[in-house]
């Protein structure tokens, strides 16, 4: 049927019949728990240019690391590898899509990564840009029934950014620390 699934940390973890992640066919990753007797796994090169990873920096904080996570499945792609373990991966399954994240503490970069994962899992990549700020530290909240846009600076420093509107317009914003700006649209 399709649909989307985002797994964080150890999603669907339950040791059963030699598998740890019970939805590994959906997630495209599995965790090695030492039951395969020295079976070494090839560490793939991270795929570049994927929609989910566009704003992701190499040093993004994903919280406590998960170890021994490897790709499984033909459609699975690693987007970030740390300590020889998959930290971010995407997978297509049937008509659906899944994203695996080894962790996700709160922060602007992590919020942007999660937002991109949600849009990709739902097949709505083309709808991502409208009502988005270029800088991940700035969030936009559009209220169509009220005709208002709220632009929030989540940083404790001044931020200059571009906001993309649904009609193709762009507007520059200079925001003071933790500022909230309302505007009619």
Predicted regions and their residues:
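A conserved amphipathic helix/loop scaffold
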Residues: 1-185
């Amino acid at each position: 049927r399709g649909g989307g699934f985002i797994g964080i940390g150890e999603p669907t973890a339950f040791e059963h019949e030699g598998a740890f992640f019970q939805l590994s066919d959906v997630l495209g990753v599995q965790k090695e728990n030492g039951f395969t007797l020295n079976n070494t796994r090839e560490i793939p090169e991270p795929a570049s240019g994927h929609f989910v990873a566009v704003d992701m920096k190499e040093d993004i904080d994903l919280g406590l690391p998960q170890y021994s996570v490897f790709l499984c499945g033909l459609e699975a792609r690693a987007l970030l590898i740390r300590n020889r373990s998959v930290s971010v991966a995407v997978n297509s399954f049937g008509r659906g899509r899944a994203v695996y994240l080894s962790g996700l503490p709160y922060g602007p970069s992590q919020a942007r990564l999660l937002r991109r994962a949600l849009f990709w899992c739902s097949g709505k990549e083309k709808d991502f840009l409208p009502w988005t700020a270029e800088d991940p530290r700035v969030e936009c909240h559009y209220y169509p029934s009220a005709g208002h846009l709220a632009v929030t600076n989540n940083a404790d420093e001044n931020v200059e950014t571009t906001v993309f509107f649904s009609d193709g317009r762009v507007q520059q914003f200079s925001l003071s620390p933790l500022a909230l700006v309302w505007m009619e649209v």
